């Protein structure tokens, strides 16, 4: 259980600051008789104080051998060494420092020594390097700004590249954390910054042979130029736009793929009326076909009257939304008609790999 405080037994004792007269009585009694038993000393010395208050006043202020003033470097090193061995046993630590009291050492440790160890990155409890110390990392932005101002990066484009700044900042953070966690030397990150700021172009790897790294070859100059002299750029001008493809079919201007009546044409073309009936046939001519970037012209030899079903097949915007099976059936029926020798047959033959005009 321990002893109860002496002040609980002494009711009505004086508390608070000591007066000079009380200091003189305590000093005179101890110099003449010694302190002896601190519980009985106040009555013997004629003081209205408790024994604990008399002891603390003598040990911390009235002793003749007490040392006052700033702690020396030798005393600080002794305190750190003894604290690592003994912990917070201030009375035992004070026994190794003549003239210093345990209360004075404790106050000095809490106000000065503890903060100094934290600034040095040392845990004041275990006296080992701190692994959760973030203070070296907090000044990375200042270090980065100073490096940029001093021109250490040697690249003014870094200021306009937020991604490079973020990457360098991450490298700085990782480097600091590794320095704190691992005691071994960490490689300098200047090489990382050099590779980051001056990246080398990546070569093109041949997909057929992964062991060889070759630049991408340019295609032959005349590969995509046909005999008629039409280049891919010129042929692209002849390709119709899918948005306004029906605007060019004005009054019997449909190419000669099939023979169409004006009634069927009016039915297929959006925005026209089906009441007008014209029996004139559309002229036959050359049907332009495209293979890649090449413009090919094939004469239309067959003629077939187009029904609304096939007309809707040629113009998707007017066709009703049907299932995939209906579409395939209509397409097969269309291919089985008299168009085996037409432009579509030629176009299908051109798309086959065996009859491709372009050598691969």
Curated annotation (Swiss-Prot):
GO biological process, one term: regulation of phenylpropanoid metabolic process
Domain HTH myb-type: 10-62, 63-117
Lineage top rank: taxon: Eukaryota
Molecular function terms, GO-annotated: DNA binding; DNA-binding transcription factor activity
Presence of the UniProt keyword DNA-binding in the record: yes
InterPro entries (alphabetical): Homeodomain-like_sf, Myb_dom, Myb_TF_plants, SANT/Myb
Keywords: DNA-binding, Nucleus, Repeat
Start and end residues of each stretch annotated as Disordered: 299-324
DNA-binding interval(s): 38-62, 90-113
Pfam family, one: Myb_DNA-binding
A single cellular component GO annotation: nucleus
Location within or outside the cell: Nucleus
Main location: nucleus
The protein, known as: Transcription factor MYB39
Organism: Arabidopsis thaliana (Mouse-ear cress)
